[in-house]
Amino acid sequence: MAERGSDIRPGQILDHNGSLYLVVKTMHTQPGKGGAYIQAELKNLKTGAKYQERFRSDGYVKRAIVEEVEYQYIFGDGASLTLMNTATYEQVSISADMLGEKGVYLKEGIILTLSFYQGQVVAARVPDYVVLEVVETESVIKGQTASSSYKSAVLENGERISVPPFIKVGERIVVYTVDDTYYERAKD
C-alpha cells in the first residue's frame, strides 16, 4: 500500500528496497532551500541493523501489509518470550530482541501487539502507555516551584525517569513508552 512520505509514523513497517523496515523515529525537516522531507530511523527486520533514510514529504513509500494481533505475555527466559493469543489461546515464542530496549516494560499479563507478514512474526511492540509503581524518588524542597521542575524517580522495572515533584514512593504512574516519559498518575 503506497503512502505519502509525510504520513510515515514510528511503529509502521515499510517495504523499502526489497526488505522490511520498522520505522523507529521520524522527524519532519523543512530546509530553507529545497523541498521538505522526513528524516526516518529505520530498523531492518531481518538483520536488525539501523540506518537513517530521507523520504520526500510529497513522495510515496510502500507500506508493508501486515496483520496485527494482540498477544498476552506469559513468561520469558531471557532469550525468548512466550506469548498467548488473547482470542484463540494459541501460544507462540519470539526472540526477546524483537522488543529491543522496550523489553524493560515487560511484566506478566501485559498485552503486546505482534505484526505478522506472510505468516511470520516480524515485529513486536509494547503498549504506548503502561502503569508502573514508583519505588524510589528524591524528596521535594519547598520553594522550588519558580519554574516547572521535575525530579528523578526509579520505577518497579528499574528504569529511571523524570516525574513532577508531587509524585511519592508507592504511587502508580502511567508511562508513555514511545519516549519513556511520565504521562500522568494512574487512575486505579
Swiss-Prot record:
Which GO cellular component terms are attached?
Answer: cytoplasm
**Cellular localization per UniProt:** Cytoplasm
- Give the record's keywords alphabetically: Cytoplasm, Elongation factor, Protein biosynthesis
In terms of Pfam families, this protein maps to: EFP (PF01132), EFP_N (PF08207), Elong-fact-P_C (PF09285)
InterPro entries according to UniProt? Elong-fact-P_C, NA-bd_OB-fold, Rib_uL2_dom2, Transl_elong_fac_P/YeiP, Transl_elong_KOW-like, Transl_elong_P/YeiP_cen, Transl_elong_P/YeiP_CS, Transl_elongation_fac_P
List the pathway annotation.
Protein biosynthesis; polypeptide chain elongation
Which CDD domains does the annotation name?
S1_EF-P_repeat_2
Main location as per UniProt: cytoplasm
Domain of life of the source: Bacteria
What processes in GO biological process is this protein linked to?
peptide biosynthetic process
The family classification in the record reads: Belongs to the elongation factor P family.
Q: Which PANTHER family match?
A: ELONGATION FACTOR P, TRANSLATION ELONGATION FACTOR KOW-LIKE DOMAIN-CONTAINING PROTEIN
What is this protein's function?
Answer: Involved in peptide bond synthesis. Stimulates efficient translation and peptide-bond synthesis on native or reconstituted 70S ribosomes in vitro. Probably functions indirectly by altering the affinity of the ribosome for aminoacyl-tRNA, thus increasing their reactivity as acceptors for peptidyl transferase.
Instruction: Tell me the protein's name.
Output: Elongation factor P
